[in-house]
Amino acid sequence: NTPNEYERTLAVLKKTMDLQSAAVDEDFNPCELNDEELYELMRNVADDFGIVNPFPDKERFYDIYRTLKNFEDVTWTDIIEYGDRRFKFRIPEALIDEMEKNFIEGFQEVLIPEAEKFSPCLERLVEAHGDSHFMLTTMDNFYYKILNEMFSDNEMVDVKQTSIYEYEFTSEKFDLILAVPIFGVRDKADEQSTFICREYDMIAAENLALHLKSEGILSIVLPAKITFGGGRVKELREFLQSMYCIKEIAELPSGIFENTAVKAYLLTITTGRTDEVTIKRYVTNTKNPRKDGIGRLVVQDDTFVLEDELTDMGDWNVDRIFESQDEDWIRFQESNVKKQELGTVASIFRGKAVSHKDPTGNIGVVNISNIGEYEIDYSSLDHLEEEERKVTNYLLKDGDLLIPARGTAIRVAIFKEQIYPCIASSNVIVIRAIDESLSITYLKLFFDSPLGRKMLITRQQGTAVMNISYKELNNIEIPLPSVEEQKQIADTYTREFEVYKKTIQEAESRWSSVLAELQERI
């Protein structure tokens, strides 16, 4: 967060008013500063805050100062909160309430980095746990001054201007760390960084864990990438699991933060001992948290896995953990039906990125919006002008199964060959049977089933918007009965679907006729 001009100006005015209220004469009696003394005091305060004089016009300063004196006291928390919330990252109070549950009775050394994000709950936290000693950090000089003012009379609070994205930001260790680091930004640490990852959120997780005391707890919010990412992110997961104990992994609801759609998780990491890892999925008690706010977080699903089991999984996929304990999944695993990984009977690939559209182009492009619940809408395809040989590897074939890779809903439809060549856009996944051992119609029916839909959902790479990895689909284990049984199922589906469409068309036609007759009588 970066303080805005209004925050800075309010801070200068408040500090000036506080100093004026505390002013005394030679006999230590309260005294009123004259206008010149007051203006000079304001300039000194601005300089102390590292701010350019916000009132070069003296008369404007006097007018605003006198006006503010007639209002209720402005608090330092009010100043941090002031400004357009769209440009301020704030942690919802409901989330802070969950993080606060890690406090224990008695004295603790507590670290809250980038503490300005925790307003307006910061003062409440410190007051509620008055037996503990708090270190509050911030990277910003202005917020450093504000936090010092906020807790100037509290000996149990120290404020430090430092960065948790640098080694040895402090030499101290803590019993409890509550952190919501920078995430959802493209900036990374330079390549000379000695941390495992270059992303700032991942750096924070590694660095803060190093500052835990024995039996210490780190409660940290991280983007979903920590649960599934490969490469260095996977190395970080392995580091955390080998050096510490993962106590809890909790999926946070989409839209919990006002100014980012990044899917996030609340992780609880400890230097203590634990054999079980609690797995949770939170929802909000309001339907639309962005519009209605969040009263509290409610646990929708709750289970656990053994720490060794989590290590063997290779990732922290919460959906997959719940799937493995789902009744439909257990029945499927225990059934005698033949099971096969999808990648062994089908080829799976992403469509092609299309940068230039041409309404009169020779090649049709199937986008997510064209994929319906049952069929593809060919009437509204985009088109591309391109030599067919240049898109040969992407040309769709009759019977290909198309699934949106991104979006808000999972739909599965079978491509029917058109009189012109077609390709899928890059946001569409194509599944093509390698041979006759797999019926694509049967596969569509399976993916439309509750179990099949759950399997697709667990292959999402956690973001607020659906994002399915086509590579992950290779590993989905599907029921694969005999070719004859698949054909019987597919034939019945196709036949009855045609009856369904005809029935709908006849009903719509009849309804239109009835409406027309009734309207003529009006």
Give the label of every model feature segment.
Residues 82-179, 184-186, 223-224:
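Conserved S-adenosyl-L-methionine
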Residues 197-268:
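Conserved Class I SAM-dependent methyltransferase catalytic core
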Residues 259-338:
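Flexible, glycine-/basic-rich loop-and-beta segments that form/coincide
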Residues 267, 421-429, 461-487:
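A short glycine-rich beta-alpha junction/loop motif
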Residues 304-358, 482-522:
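Non-catalytic DNA-recognition/assembly elements of restriction-modification systems
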Residues 340-354, 369-398:
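Sequence-specific dsDNA recognition surfaces
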Residues 392-394, 401-447:
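A short beta-sheet element
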